[in-house]
Design a protein with these regions (language model features):
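Active-site phosphate-binding/coordination module
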Residues: 2-96
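Conserved acidic, metal-coordinating active-site core of Asp-based
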Residues: 77-189
């Protein structure tokens, strides 16, 4: 952290690029000398914590809730967390009930899919690893338009906007801020 503070004090720009949402990234922003907009939601958004505003957002398609429902109908053993710009919604309480040991997020809000009215940024599918192959085969066969499914851990598959990525968002951020060069350092914080 001291090296980052020195870097920033000499005019460097430091940002975070993460799959987390705005409020789940905020504790990291408060711990580190972040002085530049951050890439969040796996590249689905760029958020400036200094002005508290989104500079870019890529939402899931409007009909993505139908995709989630179809996946839930086909795989009733999974739990789904639907994520909008502000909240993580534990659909029907399945994550807390069945996957609390692998996704112990206490900040989720229990909701039904039909209750969600806001645009979604991503969907998190929690499942036991033995279902991953069958799940991925199902979504690949369905070819849901406008989204992609990415396994990100043994118990988690994320549904993301088709063209969002951290790399694409970093490119957009560089263009917006007229940055000519970028370096990336992976930093794992506990």
């Amino acid at each position: 952290v001291q090296a980052l503070k020195r870097f920033v004090s000499k005019g460097g720009h430091f940002a975070i690029s993460t799959g987390r949402g705005r409020e789940f990234t905020r504790p990291l922003v408060e711990q580190l000398p972040v002085n530049f907009p951050c890439v969040i939601f796996n590249g689905g958004a760029i958020y400036d914590y200094s002005t508290e505003e989104y500079l870019m957002e890529i939402d899931l398609p409007a009909h993505s809730s139908e995709y989630i429902q179809e996946v839930m109908d086909r795989f009733p053993q999974i739990a789904v967390i639907a994520v909008d710009a502000d909240h993580y919604f534990d659909i029907d309480g399945g994550a807390a009930e069945h996957y609390g040991d692998v996704y112990p997020n206490k900040s989720t809000v229990k909701a039904a899919m039909s209750d969600l009215k806001s645009k979604l940024m991503k969907g998190l599918m929690l499942l036991h690893p033995q279902w991953t192959e069958e799940f991925m085969a199902f979504v690949e066969e369905k070819k849901f338009p406008g989204v992609r499914f990415v396994p990100t851990s043994p118990h988690l598959i994320e549904m993301l906007p088709e063209h969002s990525s951290k790399g694409n968002a970093l490119q957009k951020l560089m263009e917006k801020k007229k940055i000519q060069a970028l370096t990336e350092q992976y930093l794992k914080l506990m």
